[in-house]
Amino acid sequence: MVDQRIKFRHLQTFVEVARQKSVIRAAEILHVSQPAVTKTIRELEDVLGVSLLEREGRGIRISRYGEVFLRHAGATMTALRQAVDSVSQEAARAGPPVRVGALPTVSVRIMPKAMSGFLAEKTGSPVKIVTGENAVLLEQLRVGDLDLVVGRLAAPQKMAGFSFEHLYSEKVRFVVRAGHPLLSPGLSVFDHLHEYPVLMPTRQSVIGPVVEQFLIANGVPALPIRIETVSDAFGRAFLRTSDAIWIISEGVVAADVADGILAILPVETGDTSGPVGLTVRADTQPSLPLSLLMQAIREAAGELFDGRTEG
């Protein structure tokens, strides 16, 4: 039986602190004072008999008890949000909202066609599609702000409480503008990599560690001109006006390469291949509109790759 001392405000406050990794930022978002947030967390810890948060330098981190509680608190918040939505939808005769986090590789390559297929179903559901780093999107999925994340499979330690469905596999590519000097026959890309600015995924991105390991394995421990970014808009614009090299998931630039605007350098990147697919919370059942969108994404991926395993 649920302890009657645990109120909605306890769950809401804890989930927000966990999401922001900061009592101060959580207080700002909840429009309450910092002491009020601290007091609410302490009340919750007293009821549970464990510490949910721990000091880490000048900040805080979630304890192992907090991680366990967050999974269930997030599920509770999601269920409550769905209950509220269902009443609103019944009154408005609209479908439940669908909130999707899409990594850049699928935002460009898969989602446009999938969305066209979904809209043809006429569910009446409002749709929100956001993009960003995988870690951020998974955190939003965990606490119920998103219903689905579409992108590369995250590291095992990040997938606790989630279910992943593989759609296809995709490599990382070394991309440059058309006419780049390194496209000349016979040149070794790795021998000349240090001569150019290199756009890299951030270390927090899902392909960041993959790229780092690949470079080290190929004798490139450090780059003198390194720019970390997850902005595909910046990457495209910068490559068009410079000799920079962009290390990025193939799907992000597939259309640019097909149009002849960008070109792929002759680097064998098979070791960077990784699964791309659908990630959902393991403890919730998708609504009918979400199920329809997931099927539309499967069909869009199937049409694009036609049975192939490499993107």
Curated annotation (Swiss-Prot):
Domain of life: Bacteria
Domain HTH lysR-type: 6-63
DNA-binding region(s) in UniProt: 23-42
Coiled coil as UniProt keyword: no
Cellular component GO terms held in the UniProt record: cytosol
GO biological process: 3,4-dihydroxybenzoate catabolic process; positive regulation of DNA-templated transcription
Coiled coil: none
Pfam families: HTH_1, LysR_substrate
The keyword Ligase is assigned to this record: no
Keyword annotations of the record: Activator, DNA-binding, Transcription, Transcription regulation
A GO MF label: DNA binding
Summary of the function given for this chain in its UniProt record: Activates transcription of the pcaDCHGB operon for the catabolism of the phenolic compound protocatechuate.
Family that this chain belongs to: Belongs to the LysR transcriptional regulatory family.
Protein name: HTH-type transcriptional regulator PcaQ
